[in-house]
């Protein structure tokens, strides 16, 4: 396995919506490196989880502005990926969530 694959996928996004999408449409959600492209994300998911990826959709999320005392600060920007896997395949990491 390539070490670069682990740098591309930062963490899984587990929300109520992502759990529903996983169960109904075989879609997995990840927070990924902001510089990663769809091809790199697809290869990383296939290498790490041993599944066949059909589609990858990415979205850039701008960080929110938050107030700290009398000053404003900004949270970090991030990138999310929605990965569709082949029907019938499962990722054990996400089972039971």
From Swiss-Prot:
Cellular component aspect of the GO annotation: ribonucleoprotein complex; ribosome
Keywords attached to this entry: Ribonucleoprotein, Ribosomal protein, RNA-binding, rRNA-binding
Superkingdom of this protein's organism: Bacteria
GO biological process, any: translation
Presence of keyword Transport: no
Gene Ontology MF: a single term: rRNA binding
InterPro entries in alphabetical order: Nucleotide-bd_a/b_plait_sf, Ribosomal_uL23-like, Ribosomal_uL23/eL15/eS24_sf
Record's keyword annotation contains RNA-binding: yes
Function text: One of the early assembly proteins it binds 23S rRNA. One of the proteins that surrounds the polypeptide exit tunnel on the outside of the ribosome. Forms the main docking site for trigger factor binding to the ribosome.
NCBIfam families from the UniProt entry: PRK05738.1-3, PRK05738.2-4, PRK05738.3-2
Oligomeric and partner information: Part of the 50S ribosomal subunit. Contacts protein L29, and trigger factor when it is bound to the ribosome.
Entry-linked PANTHER family: 60S RIBOSOMAL PROTEIN L23A
Classification via HAMAP family: Ribosomal_uL23_B (MF_01369_B)
Family: Belongs to the universal ribosomal protein uL23 family.
Protein name: Large ribosomal subunit protein uL23
Organism per entry: Syntrophobacter fumaroxidans (strain DSM 10017 / MPOB)
